[in-house]
Amino acid sequence: NYPNFEPEEIDLWLNRSQDRFVKQRYSHDPKNETFELTQKRTDDLRKVVTETTIIPSITQTPIKPNGILFELPDGTLGTDIYWFAINEECEIRYEDCNGSWVDERNGVYAIQHDDYNKLVDDPFNKPAKDVVLRLMHNRFAELLTDGTFTINKYFLRYVRQPITLDIINSPGIPCELADHTHAEIVAGAVTMALENIASPRFQTHLISEMTAE
């Protein structure tokens, strides 16, 4: 026999399952496909895919030379919280050979910090007008230039954090993911809850998380 779950516990497991569902659909693919390569995976996440245009941050303390910081959505100025990048572009500005200023839209290429030193010394991959590199730094995207141009705007399409489920205080706000995903999310919540019951070592961790939330 299993005990009845308190509303706070139900909220916890539903939100854990919802978050896991989104993260798995975005990243977990044994065939190494992106989530948009299958129609179901695209449909699963379409409600939490959004896009925004970001201007350079007022606070500029870039870590790398010629870096420009753009503040990622974190819920401070709106409800959206950035999770995963899908597509990135930027608008650069440079002075051409005639002394005129040119605005141009180009792609942005994500790199890892471990690869930075290698790429900046590579004549074919270092930052350039048509090769704008991007590092993540705390709550910022740091776009890298070669110093001959600046960046006016950062165009970001991304997966955002889904709205938190709260059956106690907001019972009228349903799961915002596509309707066909709801049964999978509930099933995932049930599975995790039952696994928690079967593994007592998780009980203290569960109580601690509920207290923190």
Predicted features along the sequence, with ranges:
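Glycine-enriched, solvent-exposed interface loops adjoining structured elements
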Residues: 1-213
